[in-house]
Amino acid sequence: MNLDKTVHFDFGKNSPKNVHETLVTVYQTLEDKGYNPINQIVGYLLSGDPAYIPRYNDARNLIRKHERDEIIEELVKNYLDKGNTK
């Protein structure tokens, strides 16, 4: 292995769909448990503390499969793709 070259890692084309599916599952789980889903997800994304996400429905394990920056990137892309650029 050549240590002089930077290796490029690509999350793949399925990653955004997986992030979306994960966020939908986590959101629904948080609602089911009586939490404010937006506040809890934002708390997790800002702090990295998985305690913001319940273990119920395997939501905590699902969201931790994605890097927080990957989730934020998907949220921003989705927001801008919806025409929210004004």
Swiss-Prot record:
Superkingdom: Bacteria
InterPro entries the UniProt entry points to: IreB
A Pfam short name: IreB
Similarity comment text for this entry: Belongs to the UPF0297 family.
Name of this chain's protein: UPF0297 protein LCA_0388
